[in-house]
A protein has these predicted regions:
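Bacterial N-terminal signal peptides that target proteins for export
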Residues: 2-10
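C-terminal motif of bacterial Sec signal peptides marking the signal peptidase cleavage site
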Residues: 19-22
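First exposed extracellular module after export/assembly in secreted or surface-exposed proteins
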Residues: 2, 32-222
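Bacterial signal peptide processing site
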Residues: 24-27
Length: 222
């Protein structure tokens, strides 16, 4: 079954700035933030909205500089107003699926090989990236690493001053571990994963509509 979701880029600007809380020496901001961003130093994480969190007490926060992550944390006191830097307690983090955006006909990419079902539960744009909360099926403890890719399908010009529509497809390859693999159906589980793909070069300077397409299976597996 084919699904699509439309996103207006003007809304994405609002999403990316929702948690841009001002930082002052006396402020304490007791809330949980869940954001995409990058590792910007030892134990430092900067969100797409410009917040920087210091996870000095998090032993498990051991990622290379520049790694893109999805992080949930409890935000604490302001450390440096000039840098919008806060102390924070890490709740959890994950490395999202990512990769360069491809186009139909790209050398080495055969879209027909990426035909397994994937579902999009949420999507937003921040930091020049399309961020997606996805689900697919796989067999428990199989060890198989499934693959997802993001395909730019083209642009439709708006009529009568309407914004242009940019179409993207999220496609998936279960590597033989998915719903229709013929494996033990009783051992199938739902796998939830974040994905993030750089879309800045495709976005116009003005407003646009993003049309996102993906394929999921019906209850009978088709």
């Amino acid at each position: 079954m084919r699904f699509n979701l439309t996103i207006k880029t003007i809304a994405a600007v609002i999403v990316s700035s929702m948690f841009a809380v001002s930082c002052s020496k006396t402020s304490s901001v007791p809330y949980v933030d869940s954001s995409m961003g990058f590792v910007t130093g030892d134990n430092l994480f900067t969100t797409d909205a410009g917040m920087t969190y210091d996870f000095t007490t998090a032993e498990q926060f051991d990622f290379e500089f520049g790694t893109r992550l999805f992080v949930s944390c409890e935000v604490g006191d302001c450390i440096d107003p000039a840098k919008n830097l806060f102390s924070a307690n890490l709740v959890n983090c994950s490395v999202p699926v990512t990769g360069a955006i491809v186009r139909p006909g790209t050398s080495g990419f055969d879209k027909s090989e990426w035909k397994d079902p994937i579902s999009v539960n949420n999507a937003w744009i921040s930091g020049g990236y399309m961020n997606l909360y996805c689900s697919w099926t796989g067999h428990k403890n199989s060890g198989v690493v499934q693959r997802s890719a993001f395909v730019f399908e083209g642009t439709s010009t708006g009529i009568d001053n309407a914004p242009d529509t940019l179409s993207f497809s999220l496609v998936h390859d279960s590597e033989g571990d998915g719903f229709s693999s013929g494996g033990d159906a009783a051992n199938l589980v739902m796998i939830n994963k974040m994905a993030t793909f750089p879309v800045q070069e495709f976005l116009p300077s003005g407003n646009a509509v993003i049309r996102l397409l993906w394929t999921w299976h019906r209850s009978d597996g088709h």
